[in-house]
């Protein structure tokens, strides 16, 4: 689950061991120095390659190992992989363990049928897609893993129904907004200045001014689903008052700081 990005190494080695048995040359690449990487949560990427019978293009399959937090409202254990009526229920079964499984089974089926092919097959299991990909795809790209002549074609089996092939996606930009106030005892808020109220005023401005403008922007590209044809802004997280790691009862204080994380998605027509 990401954050914090636990079990990356275990996931990478699980897949790597399976591919190694099929003859793939397997390597594990830790993205040291990237956001989130540390000895407790190492950002370990898997890259596996199998050479064909002659020279030719390389087809590379990529899938991300991480999932976002489970959230609430599940009717099944989100990490139990419960099977019911031909469906697997769990966090990440669609985004994107299903795609990873499909890619690996497709490559294995090719080998099991004894089909010879020129060029090479590659697979990468990468980290941190859900938080920007800095330690995953971006790191491997900077190391030259996806560049020619090593790789010619890349297939990313992200979930988008079985009858659609996408050639790109919207741009992303994450940002933070901070408001500040003055701390005081909660019984006498008039002596302080509430940073959360300031953030509320900022949010109201977004609702009144920015969101109507975003709704006017619509791409001419054949984007799916329909709602994704517009520019979007998601208020991703708000933290104020107590420390973010604090899980006890709140203390009676007027919050002197508040932080909001924004997730902005751009259309191809925007710059």
Residue ranges and their predicted role:
Residues 31-37, 162, 219-224:
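Short, solvent-exposed loop/turn elements at beta->coil junctions and helix N-caps
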Residues 105-112, 201-207, 264:
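Short glycine/serine- and small hydrophobic-enriched flexible loop segments
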């Amino acid at each position: 689950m990401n954050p914090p990005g636990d079990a990356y190494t275990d996931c990478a080695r699980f897949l790597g061991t399976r591919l190694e048995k099929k003859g793939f040359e397997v390597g594990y690449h830790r993205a040291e120095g990237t956001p989130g990487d540390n000895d407790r949560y190492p950002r370990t990427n898997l890259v596996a390659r199998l050479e064909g019978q002659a020279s030719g293009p390389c087809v590379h399959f990529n899938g991300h190992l991480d999932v976002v937090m489970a959230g609430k409202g599940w009717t099944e254990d989100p990490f139990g992989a419960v099977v019911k009526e031909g469906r697997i229920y769990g966090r990440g079964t669609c985004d994107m363990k299903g795609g990873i499984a499909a890619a690996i089974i497709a490559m294995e089926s090719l080998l099991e049928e004894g089909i010879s092919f020129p060029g090479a097959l590659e697979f990468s299991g990468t980290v941190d897609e859900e938080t920007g990909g800095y330690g995953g795809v971006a790191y491997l790209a900077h190391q030259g893993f996806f560049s020619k002549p090593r790789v010619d074609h890349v297939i990313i089996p992200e979930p988008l129904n079985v009858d659609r092939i996408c050639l790109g996606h919207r741009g992303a930009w994450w940002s933070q907004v901070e408001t500040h106030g003055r701390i005081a005892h909660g019984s006498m808020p008039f002596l302080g200045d509430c940073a959360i109220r300031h953030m509320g005023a900022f949010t109201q401005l977004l609702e009144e001014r920015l969101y109507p403008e975003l709704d006017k922007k619509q791409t001419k590209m054949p984007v799916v689903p329909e709602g994704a044809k517009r520019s979007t802004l998601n208020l991703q997280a708000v933290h104020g008052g107590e420390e973010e790691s604090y899980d006890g009862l709140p203390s009676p204080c007027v919050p002197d700081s508040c932080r909001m994380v924004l997730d902005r998605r751009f259309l191809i027509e925007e710059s």
